[in-house]
Amino acid sequence: MPVITLPDGSKREFAHPVSTLDVAADIGPGLAKACIAGRVNGELKDACDLIETDAELSIITAKDEEGIEILRHSCAHLLGHAIKQLWPQTKMAIGPVIDNGFYYDIDLEHKLTQDDIEALEKRMLELAKTNYDVVKRVVSWQEARDTFAARGEEYKIAILDENISKDATPALYHHEEYTDMCRGPHVPNMRFCQHFKLMSIAGAYWRGNSENKMLQRIYGTAWADKKALSTYLARLEEAAKRDHRKIGKQLDLYHMQEEAPGMVFWHNDGWSIFLELERFIRRKLNQYTYQEVKGPLMMDRVLWERSGHWDKYSEAMFTTSSENREYAIKPMNCPGHVQIFNQGLKSYRDLPLRMAEFGCCHRNEPSGSLHGLMRVRGFTQDDAHIFCTEDQVQAEVSSCIQMVYDTYSTFGFENIVVKLSTRPEKRIGDDAMWDRAEEALKQALRANNIEFTILPGEGAFYGPKIEFTLHDCLDRAWQCGTVQLDYALPSRLGATYVAEDNSRQTPVMIHRAILGSLERFLGILIEEYAGRFPTWLAPMQVVVMNITDKQADYVEEVVKFFKEQGIRASFDLRNEKIGFKIREHTLRRVPYLLVVGDQEMENKEVAVRTRDGVDLGKMRIEDFAAKIHQQISLRSLKLLEE
């Protein structure tokens, strides 16, 4: 007689084995109707799976994050069901859940079109609206193989042969005449899978191996109700409007071309923003007492072998040779910084030593993964490495955390998710060292009143790590900042200092990045601001326009004054209507549009309006310059009078 303990501590006793669905029905018909699956003693189970002994049970519904993930997985099976009805010759590969949706890789000679996708979506909805039950059968390995062999499903057979033990009992999920294989769980009925949309088609190699056949990958999204789906699609539409590639072209910030894949050609205005970001971080480095250094772009293979990168990372490194020596273009800055540390004898009195670089790095990312500024091959990293004693770790990490939050808040990012990755199974050092390292990171986070999630076993083999993920205005997550302890690299590269007792000791190395890749962070900012940069970042802060030729000399005089004040200003003296000029510079997202007519010229004033169309009236040029200077020095995210 199993006794079921529910999350509120209440218990229910049954005279026979029961399923999660049975328990839900015993509680009430509403919960039975909403039940998708169950978490039994911490493990997700199908709603139909029997519970034979005493257990703790949480009933999963579409209100739970796990419930949404399950219905998305079931939508992938629904997609398979529809595909096999429309194209019976299709061979099904894999159909996992991804962020906000799912995909299915299929082998079909017919190249799917947008019309086909619409037909597929229509058939999926027709099937889902019949509210058929999903039937689960647990079978032997051989029966599963025979089932898929009879259907000609060679990819399912390959999964069984290569990934599943012959002693296993795979679960088959029957969607009427369609059968799929999965660990589950899945929804018990297709009434849960009626709010979805197929999004796109792409190519994908089987097993991710370019030597295998190219399959077609169909992406979809699925949600618990119509409102959630509509909200997500509206967010995607807004994201498309904010696409940094589109805005980058509109504002003439940068371009990329086939002859240099993953490399950025910065144009004047884009480079202006890039340099402003650098200047901002450089001020932070000075505030937090860092040295700024510059290491070579390319170093001998021997050094990369000593650091361990050649063995672990060589596939992502660009290499070249000269005079019988092999070189690698650096993918990261850390080995170079250790070389700088090693020049000259270091004492414990020199520590902590904080070393920063705007390092130009290159990584040989797969061409298919490149995406505008977000995924490139050549990038600048706001990298820093702190050499310190073990006793100094907590204070230094705390300082890094403060710098991260100080920096992100300047750009308007307040929603930061923090994760602490702890010791993996394969690691250097003893448990005592890891205990101290992990506790130092925890204490630093707690000292700054930061909530964090622990990711057990996700740390690097050489030390634990803190990751900072910022959420933008569309609630998309961007992992940017990291603070990583390293107990291995200084030792591998011979870094030592003289301790207080005159012994030679190896320093702890803290890897620290805040923006990460400046290119990627600039892409994030373009999308966050939709190209409407705050005044301090805007490549052109002010444009001054005349109404007639009579004001041309005065306009040039005003612009000259602004430039002398350090304000990025330009003029527009074209023989065009003032409304046309205002519209054009509004589309260029220039923060302030200044208009000069006869009256303004006579009174040494300018008529000020913002790119949002707010009329700020007439101001003396000295007064306007003072207001702008204050806004820039405060790095305000708002325009005047907002």
From Swiss-Prot:
Keywords: Aminoacyl-tRNA synthetase, ATP-binding, Cytoplasm, Ligase, Metal-binding, Nucleotide-binding, Protein biosynthesis, RNA-binding, tRNA-binding, Zinc. Residues 243-534 are annotated as: Catalytic. Residues 1-61 form the TGS domain. Zn(2+) binds at C334, H385, H511. GO terms for molecular function: ATP binding; metal ion binding; threonine-tRNA ligase activity; tRNA binding. Its cofactor is Zn(2+). It is found in: Cytoplasm. SMART domains: tRNA_SAD (SM00863). It is an enzyme of class 6 (ligase). It catalyses: tRNA(Thr) + L-threonine + ATP = L-threonyl-tRNA(Thr) + AMP + diphosphate + H(+). One of its GO terms (biological process) is threonyl-tRNA aminoacylation. GO terms for cellular component: cytosol. PANTHER family: THREONINE--TRNA LIGASE, CHLOROPLASTIC_MITOCHONDRIAL 2 (PTHR11451:SF44), THREONINE-TRNA LIGASE (PTHR11451). NCBIfam families: thrS (TIGR00418). Homodimer. Catalyzes the attachment of threonine to tRNA(Thr) in a two-step reaction: L-threonine is first activated by ATP to form Thr-AMP and then transferred to the acceptor end of tRNA(Thr). Also edits incorrectly charged L-seryl-tRNA(Thr). This is Threonine--tRNA ligase. It comes from Shewanella oneidensis (strain ATCC 700550 / JCM 31522 / CIP 106686 / LMG 19005 / NCIMB 14063 / MR-1).
